A protein has these predicted regions:
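Domain-edge interaction signal
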Residues: 1-100
Length: 100
């Protein structure tokens, strides 16, 4: 079952020490989605659809959630986002992406 977009975004932001910008988050989310799909027969990590924008892939719902922060750091604006259990295999992909 795919995770909620906000849950993955919160996990990545938190794992990155809340230092990522909108542009960085979009790219990390895209990488996580593509890596996860590649390893899991096309099953998505999270529900969402990316679009090709001038500066790279963008998930519009996520963009509108964090666009007010411009190129600055995104604080914890993901209310209602669920966490991931320690043994959740989706964490491996998100952890790997955050190391890049």
């Amino acid at each position: 079952m795919a995770a909620r977009l906000e849950s993955v975004a919160k996990y990545i932001c938190k794992k990155s020490g809340w230092t990522v910008s909108n542009l960085q988050l979009q790219k990390l989310m895209y990488l996580a989605q593509m890596i996860y799909m590649g390893r899991n027969n096309g099953k998505p990590l999270f529900d969402g659809t990316f679009q090709a924008w001038d500066y790279g892939p963008v998930e519009p719902n996520l963009y509108h959630t964090v666009k007010g922060y411009g190129s600055g750091r995104i604080p914890d604006v993901f209310s209602g986002a669920l966490g991931f259990e320690e043994d959740d295999p989706r964490r491996k992909v998100m952890d790997d992406v955050c190391k890049r």
